[in-house]
Structure formats: C-alpha cells, structure tokens
Curated annotation (Swiss-Prot):
Stretch forming the signal peptide: none
Pfam families: HTH_WhiA, LAGLIDADG_WhiA, WhiA_N
Keyword annotations from UniProtKB, A to Z: Cell cycle, Cell division, DNA-binding
The protein's role, per its UniProt record: Involved in cell division and chromosome segregation.
InterPro entries: Homing_endonucl, Sporu_reg_WhiA_N_dom, Sporulation_regulator_WhiA, Sporulation_regulator_WhiA_C, WhiA_LAGLIDADG_dom
Gene Ontology biological process terms from the UniProt entry: cell division; regulation of sporulation
Xref: NCBIfam families: DNA_bind_WhiA
Keyword Cell inner membrane appears in the UniProt entry: no
The organism's place on the tree of life at top rank: Bacteria
Family membership: Belongs to the WhiA family.
Protein name: Probable cell division protein WhiA
Length: 316
C-alpha cells in the first residue's frame, strides 16, 4: 500500500489546473468516493477516502472553489489485516446547491449516475482531472513485481462506462468489468499504466513504479534464460509478442463486439506474453487445449480483419 499512498499524496499535491479542471476533479472525487446520501428526511454529501491528504484537498477545494464548508471525520475500522484508517468529508449545508455545482444532479435535480456531461464533453485537462479524482477516491495500483494493473472501483456501471469513454479521448484503452457485483475499470498494459499515471500528474510515482517493475522483469527474464535455450526462447517470445500486438489491435477494432470466449483467449495472450499456448490453455477458466486457444485467437484476428475490411468498404 505504500506506493499507492505515495501516488495519492502526489496527486493531492498536483497544482496548475484551470478552475474547470479543479471542478472536474472534485466532482469525480465526490462521485466515486460517496455522493449524495439521504439522512433523516434530508440529504448530505459525503466522500470517504483512505488518505488524509486527499480528504484535505477536497475540503479545501469545496471552500475555496465552490464556497461550501465541509468537515473531515476520522474513522478507524478493524479488519483481519489490521486497522484501516478512513477520512469522511461531509457537507451538511446547502447540499442541493453543491450537488448542482458538482454535477451530482442535473438541472431537473435528477441524480446523475455517470459523470457530469460537462466533464464527459469537456477539455482534455478536465478529463485528466476526472481520472485523477476517481483514482484518488477509489484507485488501486499493483505492487512492482506482481501482475501489472491499475484499477478504479466505480459506484455504478454508468460511471464505469463514462470513465472508459473519456480514457479513449486520452488515447488509452481501459476495460470495464464486473467483479463480485462491483463495477471496475482496469488497465493491465504496463505502458498504458505508466502513461495514465503521468497524465493524472503522478510523474514521480510513475517513474518509481516503472523502475521497480523493470527490475523485477529483468530478474525474471534472467532466471528464465538460465533454464532454457536462448535462441528458442527468444524466437518464441518474439512470436508471442507479435501475437499480443495483433490481439491488442483486434480489441481496438472490435471494441465491445467480441464473443466472450474469443475475448478471454485474447486477454490471456495480452496478459501473459511470456507463456506458451499450452500454458495459456492451463490458466484459462475452464482449462482448454493449446489448439483450442490458438483457434480462438485466430478467429478473433479474422473477425477484426473482416470488420476492418467492411469499414473500409463503407468509407469508399
């Protein structure tokens, strides 16, 4: 958790944004950290964070940018892994006005389930700020040496889809998935993770994460090269890397229109570039043969090629 805490503290210290971007960040922090809550025939706005720096940023921004006072309540929750500190930013006055200002409700005072339209259709600076705020509220980052991922837990499916949509405007493909009834937005490509960290403003943490990951990968590769024939391994690694690039391109072409079995096979190829087809088949759920996984990847690439040709024909 130390690196994740460092990332969130670095993001909380980020400066230089425009007023519109600051508002987008605050709106995302409230949307992903909590939101509008009914309490005893009235409403409050609350957002729960695991970082005091993050909570203080929101409290100060609500006062300085929106003109609303907030309080921070410190709570300690006992878990099997030890105590967890949380910080609740709470607004109890002029709640409806703040909800309108931050896009929690629209002009008809209906709750917005995704991101405010001003953010979704806003500038690149606003989009980066929205991702920053969402990550500060509910972001997770893999430890170096483990399978790479950057993930944000989302309050609704609409919020997850909106976050994926604005990520595409940044040139990054984020995936929406449902995990035990929880909506998640995930990045698994290390280069995309590093880029997103930098876009959000965590440049120092991005360098640290990438450096430690590279060290771990170098050690792993050295161990594997010591146990296998160099030429064969490099040849296989090159073929797997090329296949992974083709699958990534197929995902970009097809978007969400991919059969689940083909998507699973393609994702395994992307997530485990160093593994053989036989190994991919063994880690698939349920397990399948190497011929089956090769066939699914082949059909995925054929489907993408067919789709590209159809689009090219339509564009003539």
């Amino acid at each position: 958790m130390a690196l994740l805490d460092d990332v969130k503290s670095e993001l909380a210290a980020f400066e230089g944004d425009s007023p519109a971007a600051i508002k987008a960040q605050a709106a995302a922090m409230i949307r992903f950290g909590g939101g509008l809550r009914p309490v005893q025939n009235t409403y409050v706005i609350q957002a729960v964070f695991t970082s005091l720096d993050v909570a203080e940023w929101l409290k100060n921004t609500l006062r300085n940018t929106f003109g609303h006072e907030a309080e921070i309540n410190h709570l300690t929750r006992q878990t099997p892994n030890g105590p967890v500190e949380t910080y609740v930013v709470l607004v109890t006055r002029n709640v409806v006005a703040l909800a309108l200002q931050t896009g929690l409700v629209d002009r008809r005072k209906q709750q917005v389930r995704g991101l405010p339209s001003e953010v979704v259709n806003g500038s690149i600076a606003q989009i980066k700020a929205a991702w920053r705020g969402a990550f500060m509220a509910r972001g997770f980052l893999s430890d170096p040496g483990k399978a790479s991922f950057l993930e944000i837990a989302c309050p609704t499916e609409e919020a997850a889809m909106a976050l994926c949509g604005v990520a595409r405007r940044l040139g990054i493909q984020a995936k929406h998935r449902t995990l035990r009834s929880s909506e998640r937005v995930t990045l698994k490509d290390p280069d995309a993770i590093e880029r997103m960290l930098k876009l959000m403003g965590a440049t120092r943490s991005a360098r640290e994460w990438t450096g430690k990951r590279s060290d771990g990968e170098a050690r792993g590769k050295a161990n594997r090269l010591a146990n296998f024939d160099d030429a064969n391994m490099r040849r296989s690694a090159k073929a797997a890397a090329e296949a992974s690039e083709k699958v990534q391109h197929a995902f970009e072409v097809l978007g969400d229109n991919i059969p689940d079995n083909l998507r699973q096979a393609g994702q395994l190829r992307i997530d485990h570039v160093d593994k053989s087809l036989e190994e991919l088949g063994k880690i698939a759920e349920p397990q399948i043969t190497k011929d089956a996984i090769a066939g699914r990847i082949r059909r995925l690439l054929q489907l993408a090629e067919k789709t590209e040709k159809a689009r090219a024909a339509e564009g003539k």
